[in-house]
Amino acid sequence: MPEEMRQEEEAETFAFQAEIAQLMSLIINTFYSNKEIFLRELVSNASDALDKIRYESLTDPTKLDSGKDLKIDIIPNVQERTLTLIDTGIGMTKADLINNLGTIAKSGTKAFMEALQAGADISMIGQFGVGFYSAYLVAEKVTVITKHNDDEQYAWESSAGGSFTVKVDHGEPIGRGTKVILHLKEDQTEYIEEKRVKEVVKKHSQFIGYPITLYVEKERDKEISDDEAEEEKAEKEEKEEEGEDKPKIEDVGSDDEEDTKDKDKKKKKKIKEKYIDQEELNKTKPIWTRNPDDISNEEYGEFYKSLTNDWEDHLAVKHFSVEGQLEFRALLFIPRRAPFDLFENKKKKNNIKLYVRRVFIMDNCEELIPEYLNFIRGVVDSEDLPLNISREMLQQSKILKVIRKNIVKKCLELFAELAEDKDNYKKFYDAFSKNLKLGIHEDSQNRKKLSELLRYQSSQSGDEMTSLTEYVSRMKENQKSIYYITGESKDQVAHSAFVERVCKRGFEVLYMTEPIDEYCVQQLKDFDGKSLVSVTKEGLELPEDEDEKKKMEEDKAKFENLCKLMKEILDKKVEKVTVSNRLVSSPCCIVTSTYGWTANMERIMKAQALRDNSTMGYMMAKKHLEINPDHPIMETLRQKAEADKNDKAVKDLVILLFETALLSSGFSLDDPQTHSNRIYRMIKLGLGIDEDEDVPVEEPSSAAAPEDIPPLEGDDDASRMEEVD
């Protein structure tokens, strides 16, 4: 009793972090049909703990002094209605217990709850890093006993009522590792049945790299031979304890001495004995070491699910080996969808497990695969790396560089094979197109191969997407460049002033509508010998015949004075004003210099919270105003300017045209209110409202004086109107 009281006093109670408590409530109070995934999650956690201790032991073998066998045991107990999982992994310190199991929410907790409420499958839980809590699908109470080499043995316990307790454990020492005891709910006793446990482990965890042993209590008839003296003694003692009944029965029934001896012998030979049956549940040879021809797609699917905790099958798989000076085997999978945190910088990626001669080394080896391929899942098993390799040695390893090069090559082969199946490639591209574009930005060696995998909508592709190869095959004879436009959406770019003439002349324009496209085309200068040209930048040259060239020269001469006047009025707001060859129905547009940012890129950069303002200064687009010589607005403005170049109305109209062109070209206004006031002035003029009628409309208490609204004419306000950029 005193011992029990002492233990009770030592127990500390902690509240679950709010999001975790919410998640547990959701798990407990919602009906899920596939509760069996709890076992997969707990086995997976045990495997991770074993990986960690094995990795540590490579550099410090004394870490295994507390237990050399690396294994997972599963023990069902029918009488107590418990299912226990024991691993000899790294274990947890007291701080680990408190943080990992309750007080610090993983980044995926909230995301997983949102996914669940949106109808996602509970089996996704492992992908969000909160798999442990799936134990509450079947358990009313969970006890975790754990021992880390650097700390005492602790017990964690919770019935999921919003809190948990942690105390020093004075029970049976476990050496090192973690013991998870699930006190099953009354309606979940199927998980202490031998058949059910075997079925679930085979389904979800047969490719775990450590032996999973099931311990089941069974009964058997035990035969006792005469020469087993000790057992004979035990038998005699049992007979003595049973009292005098047996001799009496024998005396009554023993007419024939032979008979009695025989019966006695039989009793000695067979007794019912309880014993613990051990069975290893995952004897399967590592799948990557087998011949790909002998492996079915179902086996690949099962391995993929056990490797990744994904609830869906993979989209594609590449299984290969490299032999020669360097030997390694690899098995690479493309998932069906991108994980929720694909581009989260701080998160350690653990997508490719590195093995050396079938011994697991690590699962977050950044040197194994470039960042843009961080969605690839799989295993790499090297014959050449040393078993005790450290992370620092890996960074310098030439062997690893060769492995990495081969993995990238095989991934690109896999993507190219997938591209032949249009439906599956669409699924892949929807999920991972950003990664391919990031690859073009980062991987100069493979840029050409990656560019062949790109798909874009275009002015001629309708709702379908086209590859650059298909675009080139449709190019006109006199077309030397691939034309593209970047923007926020297909509708925006399709109706842009920039594509008017290009499309009217029958040239195809690619629509690039993702922010990453801007970075991608900065590096992708050409494709198949054809340069990529943005229709929003200066110097757009469309193939022209002699008549068109002649007309262009005439227009330039005709509008030369207007261009000069507009440049004077707009001053530093534009680099230059020129006659355009790209406009059809718009009066003017703003184009950017060849090496500056496009309007879309400027928008993206302004949205960066941590942007470098010094870069903004010199990279922000130098704006060029291009005017349409065939548009009646420009022709009338030219005539008005010829008549009187000092006309205030001309000045106001030029500024209004410039600001409107900024908006239609995708730029933002520095002072939208002043532009709005100008538009309202124009509306007033259009409706025939007198300027003076503006005064009585103002409220007496209004802080804004009538002069604050810039008029279209007037010396004092003209300068203010010029300030709008």
UniProtKB/Swiss-Prot annotation:
User: What are the annotated GO cellular component locations?
Assistant: aryl hydrocarbon receptor complex; cytoplasm; cytosol; dynein axonemal particle; extracellular region; nucleus; perinuclear region of cytoplasm; plasma membrane
Name a biological process GO annotation.
protein stabilization
- Major site of localization recorded for this protein: cytoplasm
Q: What does the activity regulation annotation say?
A: In the resting state, through the dimerization of its C-terminal domain, HSP90 forms a homodimer which is defined as the open conformation. Upon ATP-binding, the N-terminal domain undergoes significant conformational changes and comes in contact to form an active closed conformation. After HSP90 finishes its chaperoning tasks of assisting the proper folding, stabilization and activation of client proteins under the active state, ATP molecule is hydrolyzed to ADP which then dissociates from HSP90 and directs the protein back to the resting state.
Q: Which Pfam families match?
A: HATPase_c_3, HSP90
Signals that turn on the gene: By heat shock during early embryogenesis.
- Protein family (similarity comment): Belongs to the heat shock protein 90 family.
Q: What is this protein called?
A: Heat shock protein HSP 90-beta
Organism of derivation: Danio rerio (Zebrafish)
